[in-house]
């Protein structure tokens, strides 16, 4: 006699979905927190454009966005992957990639917003259409986890540093930011909407010039007439570390999106200090999951803002 399938009430299904979503959220955050503790952060590691770029969906060819590029790059660093193409189990199966041996939990979680349309009656008795958003998680796997994985035969050459600086200058011109090339210090002044960079000859490495330029461009996106982030925070404060975190992540996302190499050691001499501030900031956060999500989201917005001034990019 066949066993009847167990039926669940609507309330039980809702409770299970809520429990599973919270478990996924905890797992997502724990991966990021552990990376911070172990100094395994993607904006602190070098990435070569020819082998590793922005995490991309294997099937749609679109770049992941929001908090997902950072969290997937963290997973790649921990596991030692350099091919940053990902897909769901079904997508890998459809692409003839062997998922044999891969268990639930072996992949990495991406998070995205789902929309639920609904209607409400306003004070005038009229029906208004509204949309409710909620966070949902999905597990994706790196192509290198597949048994029949083969490295790509053709690797893209990184865009020359001279071309990358043209992109930077285009952003500066489009936004009306004042740029001066003098002195020995790189900085952004939100009061004057001004970027100061040492002269081209002052840089011992041309890639260092690119990285420094886009780091300061990341800060410039926070101006009140752009993305309006709190700027001008005191050195060593949690808010200072938070803004530095945004600038470092946005610089990495922008440079890799434009096809360049990323070498963080060339950007910031205060990396170790910022790491300590970041840990303290994270520990002080009452809602650490949302705090990290906000940092990653702000970095993505900063990078998107720069890229939209330069070129159109296809993302998901």
Question: What does each model-identified segment do?
Answer:
Residues 2-316:
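N-terminal accessory/interface modules of nucleic-acid-binding and processing proteins
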């Amino acid at each position: 006699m066949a066993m009847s399938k167990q039926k669940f009430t609507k309330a039980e299904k809702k409770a299970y979905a809520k429990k599973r979503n919270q478990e996924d959220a905890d797992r997502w955050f724990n991966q990021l927190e552990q990376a911070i503790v172990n100094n395994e952060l993607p904006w602190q590691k070098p990435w070569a454009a020819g082998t590793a770029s922005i995490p991309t969906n294997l099937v749609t060819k679109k770049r992941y966005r929001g908090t997902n590029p950072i969290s997937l790059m963290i997973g790649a660093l921990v596991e030692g992957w350099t091919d940053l193409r990902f897909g769901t189990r079904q997508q890998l199966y459809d692409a003839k990639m062997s998922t044999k041996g891969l268990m639930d939990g072996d992949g990495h979680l991406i998070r995205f917003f789902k929309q639920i349309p609904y209607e409400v009656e306003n004070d005038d008795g009229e029906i208004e259409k509204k949309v409710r958003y909620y966070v949902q998680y999905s597990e994706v796997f790196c192509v290198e986890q597949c048994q029949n994985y083969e490295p790509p035969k053709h690797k893209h050459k990184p865009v020359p540093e001279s071309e990358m600086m043209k992109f930077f200058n285009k952003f500066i011109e489009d936004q009306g930011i004042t740029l001066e090339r003098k002195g020995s210090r790189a900085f952004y002044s939100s009061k004057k909407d001004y970027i100061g960079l040492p002269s081209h000859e002052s840089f011992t490495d041309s890639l260092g010039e690119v990285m420094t330029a886009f780091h300061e461009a990341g800060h410039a996106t926070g101006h009140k007439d752009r993305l309006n982030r709190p700027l001008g925070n005191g050195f060593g404060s949690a808010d200072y570390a938070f803004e530095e975190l945004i600038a470092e992540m946005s610089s990495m996302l922008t440079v890799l999106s434009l096809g360049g190499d990323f070498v963080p050691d060339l950007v910031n001499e205060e990396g170790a200090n910022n790491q300590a501030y970041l840990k303290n900031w994270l520990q002080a956060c009452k809602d650490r999951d949302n705090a990290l999500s906000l940092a990653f989201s702000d970095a993505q917005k900063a990078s998107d803002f720069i890229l939209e001034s330069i070129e159109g990019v296809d993302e998901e």
